[in-house]
Curated annotation (Swiss-Prot):
Keywords: Secreted. Belongs to the Frog skin active peptide (FSAP) family. Septenin subfamily. Its main location: secreted. It is found in: Secreted. It comes from Osteopilus septentrionalis. The keyword Secreted applies. The lineage of its organism: Eukaryota, Metazoa, Chordata, Craniata, Vertebrata. This is Septenin 2d. One of its GO terms (cellular component) is extracellular region. May act as an antimicrobial peptide. Expressed in skin glands.
Length: 23
């Protein structure tokens, strides 16, 4: 469960960064 939560948070942050356009 912990791993899934961490992965989910990373994915969410990745999507936000992608939307902003910052690499």
């Amino acid at each position: 469960i912990i791993d899934d939560t961490i992965n989910g948070a990373i994915t969410t942050a990745d999507n936000i960064v992608g939307r902003i356009g910052i690499i």
